[in-house]
A protein has these predicted regions:
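Extracytoplasmic/secreted envelope proteins and their assembly/folding machinery
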Residues: 16, 63, 67-70, 97, ...
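Short linear capping/connector segments at secondary-structure termini
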Residues: 42-49
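Glycan-recognition/cleft segments
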Residues: 316-328
Length: 361
């Protein structure tokens, strides 16, 4: 790259820093997938080398190399993108420091920090008999992770995104969260990919057979649905599961595990009541921005008499299993997290969305 004279010296240095960060990022992905790995450092990888000749580096060596590479890249990368129309999405100082904080947080958790109560990894050694995993917990790793996160906050570049029009607390919370993924390059995003054509996601979450265009293929599990807290109490309603799979309920959360309510008004369509299982009521605004459940209406924004399309997933329902098609919702839920409510999915218009790899929240 130093031979590319069409670039300024500063541009060349930034590109080198981008490459250094991306190399560290992909090392981190390998580390998450496989645990401690072999580090080539600045050597050119020998593709012909035999795996039995090389050995894994230790957890601390992997983490130390990755986080230092990210920190060093951050010293050169720009604080903000000066030409966002052309270059938004390229790496910045905040991207490198933010991902570094995630690396350090990952390394501080018990799995890679002493192995917790079961001592995971303590018996693993390399060919030389050197332990690959830390042999005890180091509480300073949590401090280092917190300090790394504070460095990102102190850049004063990123802010939590808030909806600017709603006054109702539930709607404000719901739309603030939703807009993080539907408003292009909003102030909360640190590393993201913008999808101009939202079909890659939205068609696959629209309930099938209601409009003839949905596939209903991406569905949340019951455990994910249970993971959202209650709006009023802020408590998590399900704290675990019994041996038979039934949930353990926090009685102080305000959660109702049984029964149905007729005429309940969902935050997104308050002028049209629905019959709802009581467990769907009173949840955090992020729940209603993310989870579409049985009995809800899929809303079209054009104001016609067909604006509200009822969706039911049970046998014989409007979006139930059909023998002629493999497209059906197995869990009774679909996602609405990345779907802009202003798009009309009946017309094969899928809008856009942002996939966040790292954000301030």
């Amino acid at each position: 790259i130093d031979e590319c004279k069409e670039l300024t010296g500063e541009e060349r240095e930034v590109m080198k820093a981008e490459a250094r960060f991306l190399r560290a990022y992909y090392y981190f992905n390998l580390f998450k997938q496989y645990g401690p790995i072999y580090l080539w450092y600045d050597q050119i990888a020998d593709l012909a080398i035999k795996s039995e000749v090389i050995d894994r580096n230790t957890v601390d060596e992997c983490v130390g190399f990755i986080e230092k590479e990210m920190y060093d890249a951050a010293q050169i990368l720009p604080k903000t993108i000066q030409d966002p129309t052309t270059w938004m999405g390229r790496m910045t100082k905040g991207a490198a420091l933010g991902m570094r904080s995630r690396v350090l947080l990952f390394a501080a958790r018990p799995l890679f920090n002493g192995g917790g109560s079961i001592g995971y990894g303590r018996g693993m050694v390399n060919h030389e008999g050197k332990p690959i995993f830390p042999q005890g917990e180091d509480l300073n790793k949590w401090t280092k992770a917190a300090e790394a996160a504070k460095m990102v906050i102190d850049l004063d570049v990123y802010k939590l995104h808030f909806n600017k029009t709603e006054t109702d607390p539930v709607l404000k919370a719901m739309n603030s969260y939703r807009e993080v993924f539907t408003e292009k390059w909003n102030e909360e995003l640190i590393i993201a990919r913008y999808y101009k054509d939202g079909e890659v996601w939205n068609q696959r979450v629209v309930p099938p057979r209601v409009f003839g265009v949905g596939l209903g293929g991406y569905t949340p599990t019951m455990k994910l649905v249970d993971a959202y807290p209650m709006m009023a109490s802020g408590r998590y309603p399900v704290t675990g599961y019994k041996a038979d799979g039934s949930p353990i309920i926090d009685d102080k959360s305000g959660y109702e595990a049984n029964g149905f309510t007729d005429g309940w008004l969902h935050p997104t369509h308050r002028d049209k009541g629905i019959k709802v299982h009581n467990s769907m009521k009173g949840r955090d605004g992020r729940f209603y921005a993310s989870i579409f459940f049985n009995g809800m209406y899929w809303i079209h924004p054009d104001g016609t008499k067909e604006q509200y399309a009822p969706v039911t997933f049970f046998t014989g329902g409007t979006s139930s299993y059909a023998h002629s098609s493999g497209d059906y919702v197995k869990t009774g839920f679909v996602f609405t997290k990345f779907t802009d409510p202003n798009i009309d999915t009946r017309k094969n218009t899928w809008g856009s969305f942002t996939w966040s790899y790292l954000r301030l929240a």
